Amino acid sequence: MDPRPPVVRDQDRIDVRLTGEAEYLIPFTFIEALNEGTLFDRPAHAFLDAAREHRLFQVVNQTTDNIIGTGIIQGSGDERSTKRAEVGGLMFHPAARGFGLCSLLVKIMMVYAIKESGRDSPDEEYLAHVVDGNGLPLHSLLEAGFRPIGPVDVHRGDIDAVIDYMIKGGESVVHMHGFVFDREAIRKLVSSLWRFVNEDHGVITRSDPAGDVRLTVDFSQVIPPTDLKI
């Protein structure tokens, strides 16, 4: 008999948190363990840098104190030109999927990055890349205000990550679908998060043949409720 509790259970409480420097290895090892070959293999120092810049997020089941999801905003590009940041590392434990937690996390990440972090600049582009055949993040990105920019070939060195295992035989690039965040969508995201907190009371439900599973999500450590002004 497995003594470990289920990843999520009915009535569990879920926290979305910024990851501190001392904890950066938690999301790093989480992704390392669960990566299905669809995410960039980012080095540990990329997670440390993101933690220092308050751009590393983790989703934790407060009831069991176990991590169930991650997200990272990784700086890239030449500081002398248009700044770019890669939104990725979106990974949820398979047993925590189907609730809409990934969509919610991306919304929180983008509202925090643009309105709360103090690091955003109007010329910064937030990009996301999804490898061919990986449909899981598409809905989450579109719901969170990203728009498709078409096929993108990612070469070695384009991002601080190992991509060799994603390159198909005989090729030198990874074929991906590109997305860019539409800054005009930020008001809609704030409104969506306000409704989630004030009308849905932070509760999300996944229908299950064995009975509905209800989770209460709190992201006030990242975005105070008073900052969700519409």
Features from the language model and the residues they span:
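Conserved acetyl-CoA binding element of GNAT-fold acetyltransferases
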Residues: 74, 81-94, 129
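Glycine-rich phosphate/pyrophosphate-binding loop shared by adenosine-nucleotide-utilizing enzymes
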Residues: 64-70, 85
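Active-site rim helix/loop that mediates acceptor-substrate recognition in acyltransferases
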Residues: 32-63, 72
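Short amphipathic alpha-helix that is part of the acyltransferase structural core
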Residues: 2-42
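C-terminal "cap" of GNAT-fold acetyltransferases
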Residues: 154-230
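Conserved acetyl-CoA-binding loop-helix of GNAT-fold acetyltransferases
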Residues: 92, 98-115, 139, 143
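Conserved beta-strand-loop-alpha-helix junction that forms the acyl-donor binding cleft
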Residues: 123-138, 153-159
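Conserved acetyl-CoA-binding loop of GNAT-fold acetyltransferases
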Residues: 142-152
